[in-house]
A protein has these predicted regions:
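Transmembrane helix-bundle signature of multi-pass membrane transporters/permeases
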Residues: 4, 86, 90, 116, ...
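N-terminal signal-anchor transmembrane alpha helix
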Residues: 7-28
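Interfacial/capping segments of alpha-helical transmembrane domains
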Residues: 23-44, 159-173
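Single transmembrane alpha-helix segments in multi-pass membrane proteins
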Residues: 25-29, 35, 45-98, 112, ...
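Short helix-capping/hinge motifs at transmembrane helix termini and TM-loop junctions
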Residues: 29-31, 99-101, 134, 156-160, ...
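A cytosolic-side transmembrane-helix exit/cap motif
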Residues: 55, 102-105, 130-133, 157-167
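Transmembrane helix-bundle core of multi-pass membrane transporters
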Residues: 141, 145-214
Length: 215
């Protein structure tokens, strides 16, 4: 089997095996797997709104997967991506809430850059420790997930100003000028929350592919 064919076959076989195992488990517990999978796919792809919501949910997952792929290419196992993503999200949300009146383009560019920097810094810590002290990146990244989680929670509770908060533990919604949603994309997908984050993720896919394959 060629390498190219293997790259396509392995994920496909994994998905099919997962569905097969799921079907067996449903049969064991007395459920009909045919109707279960029918409902799954008809709900997911049965309307433009649902398709838009799927694409919206895919966007951060694509970016997180890209982060893993870069580390994996370097021979490292980065299991700290949830924490690194949370660091980026928290930083970007703080900026969006702190400067709600910025033009949309400026706000989006700034939040993307701030999220990249915050996630990059938290990802660099285990990398530096691995490079200079020989520590296991697996252990460090797992531990940092929890550190970042609690730090982010405290930033929301105590680091956000009163006008940024809806309650003691939740921020306000970001302004329309800072949102990645647009009226055009929302109307295109029947009112879903589909936004330009999906297109940013696709651009990131191309950039990472170019970096890994062409440089």
């Amino acid at each position: 089997m060629s390498k190219k064919l293997q790259n396509w076959a392995v994920p496909l076989i994994a998905v099919l095996l997962g569905m097969l195992i799921g079907a067996v488990l449903m049969l064991i517990f007395g459920y009909d797997p045919f109707w279960a999978y029918y409902d799954l796919f008809s709900t997911a792809f049965g309307s433009l709104k649902n398709i838009g919501e799927i694409l919206r949910a895919m966007s951060p997952l694509i970016l997180i997967a890209l982060g893993f792929s870069v580390a994996s290419k370097a021979g490292l196992f980065n299991i700290g991506l949830p924490g690194q993503a949370l660091a980026g999200w928290t930083s970007a949300v703080w900026f969006a809430l702190a400067f709600p009146e910025l033009p949309k383009v400026v706000s989006i560019v700034c939040t993307v850059i701030i999220g990249l920097v915050a996630g990059g810094i938290t990802g660099a810590v285990p990398g530096i420790l691995r490079a200079y002290l020989g520590t296991s990146e697996v252990i460090v990244t797992i531990m940092m997930n929890y550190i970042i989680l609690y730090v982010a929670n405290n930033i929301v509770r105590f680091g956000f100003t009163a006008d940024m908060l809806r309650s003691s533990e939740a921020s306000n919604r970001i302004s329309a000028s800072a949102s990645y949603q647009t009226d055009f994309l929302s109307s295109l997908t029947d009112g879903s929350r589909f936004n330009i984050g999906f297109f940013l993720a696709i651009v990131a896919v191309f950039l990472v592919w170019f970096m890994l394959k062409k440089t």
